[in-house]
Amino acid sequence: MSWLYALETLRHAAPWLASIFSIITYLGGEAVFFAVGLFLLWCVDKREGFYVLSVSFIGTVVNQTVKILCRVPRPWVRDPNFTIWEGARAEATGYSFPSGHSQNAVGVFGAITLWNRKKRAVLIVFPILAVLVLFSRMFLGVHTPADVFVGAGTALLLIFFVYPVFSRDRGQRTLVSWVSFLLALSLGYLLFVLLYPFPADTDPANLADAQKNAWSLVGSVSGMLAFALIEPRFINYKTEAPLLAQIVKLLGGLALALGLKEGLKPLLSLLFGAALFPNAIRYFIVVIAAGLLWPLTFPYLSKIGAKKARTEHDEQSPSPTEGTRKDDQ
């Protein structure tokens, strides 16, 4: 705790730093992982998107399992005299060890770095972002160094473990088999948190949080399996498009996905009350909408900006008569 107390002193002396790191820490949150995964799937490379999402999904199962087994309380619970940055409290749910934000940041940014390791800018920028997220979790007081480094180390192992699956195009059958494995893993985790006889001192709120995450994972991966079965054969959308079209694809798709993710909450609560299983329904619908329905618009959206791009290309290309004159000269 001495390291955290030193950071607490610095935080009190320079609250503006805490404001900056409270923004940086969101880079390790679910929303950023969600947006980055969809951006890669829609606009960059479907294999890279599945790679990053797979690292994150397996990481979540491992992270949540270790959390609920170890049941390490947060720093301010272990030491009531310790204070945290209050703006970070709302996101600091569940047990402390290991850090989910740290694992997400290293998993997402590390996987992108390994995939694009020949690009110098990526090799510099993304590792720096990951390190900043790790430091932010400690600076804000919501995690200890052990929480952060174990979460980051787990993500690093998964980055290299999953990479061979997607390092080359292995076809639809391999993709379906891989996502089926992810679904089995998610179902195993769900059964564990529902049926395991946890000790009496297990915090009910933290256990409920683990069960909610398990249902969400099952719904998400079920949607991914539907994507793997249907998209390559019946949709097979192209990620390439003019820049303006890519922006519309990304912003429109995120609005749809996030709108469904948040909009379905009150409806499902009205239908099922406080039950946790509707989280599986909600995330399944979101993934189906994002992976199978929204891409149906891509052939039409790809026309946005295409005319301008062709015009600019034609203006830069020499006319046939100009080419003839140059040849004659």
Where are these regions (language model features)?
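Membrane-embedded catalytic cores of phosphoryl/pyrophosphoryl-handling enzymes
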Residues: 36-37, 42-43, 60, 76-265
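Hydrophobic alpha-helical transmembrane segments of multi-pass membrane proteins
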Residues: 23-25, 53, 99, 149
